[in-house]
A protein has these predicted regions:
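Metal-dependent phosphoesterases centered on the DNase I-like endonuclease/exonuclease/phosphatase
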Residues: 91-179
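Structural recognition of the beta-strand scaffold that forms the well-ordered cores
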Residues: 22-25, 33, 70, 81-84, ...
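Short amphipathic alpha-helical segments, especially helix-boundary/capping motifs
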Residues: 46-47, 84-87, 124
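Short loop/turn segments at secondary-structure transitions that flank enzyme active sites
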Residues: 28-30, 88-91
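Structured beta-strand-rich core segments of catalytic domains in phosphoester-bond hydrolases
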Residues: 1-79
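A short secondary-structure junction signal
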Residues: 33-37, 83, 92-97
Length: 179
């Protein structure tokens, strides 16, 4: 990063909390059972996708741009686990593709979590909600992680659709899915 500029921290931002995330719920949040992986180091990921050359501060770099939260909800007496995140944009770096690699691992975190790598997986229904900053078909970024997550049999993609869409030249995916 550059001292005194937005790139000088664990995530891009001029001040603490810029680009953060929040959960607003009409259902009861079981905060006693919530888990926050925002402080988890990128190095603690199974097989992190590091750039080929070591990065300055690599040993203290957090995985999450904003956070990876496991938030149990009580929905009319039934448990629902909300898994929330906001991944880094996989662009705006150099040929080392640090942002693309970090975005890849931020998304792949959920697959490892479902496999039990970080101390348990949800026992009942769950929702993964947030901003992956990555399209599984179009745009820049490493598509493998989002494709693996969406292809996991434990995950159902509701594929929300928009009716009024414009297509862009070179767009391969269904533009109605770009909500």
């Amino acid at each position: 990063g550059r001292l005194g500029e937005p790139e000088d921290a664990h995530s891009y931002g001029w001040y603490a909390g810029e680009g953060g995330q929040a959960i607003l719920s009409r259902f009861a949040i079981r905060d006693d059972a919530a888990r926050d992986f925002a402080q988890m180091l990128w190095a603690d990921m199974p097989s992190p996708l590091w750039p080929s050359e070591p990065m300055p501060g690599q040993e203290v770099q957090r995985l999450s741009r904003a956070g990876h939260w496991i938030v149990p909800l009580d929905v009319r007496g039934a448990p629902l686990t909300l898994m929330s995140f906001h991944a880094t944009t996989p662009v705006f770096d150099g040929p080392e593709d640090r942002n693309g690699r970090r975005n890849h691992d931020e998304i792949l975190f959920w697959r490892y979590y479902l496999d039990g790598a970080f101390g348990g997986a949800p026992k009942g229904p769950f929702v993964i909600a947030g901003n992956a900053n990555l399209d599984p078909v179009d745009g820049e970024g490493r598509k493998t992680a989002i494709q693996v997550l969406l292809g996991d049999t434990r995950v159902q993609d509701p594929k929300p659709r928009s009716e009024r869409v414009e297509t862009t030249p070179g767009h391969k995916g269904d533009p109605k899915l770009d909500t």
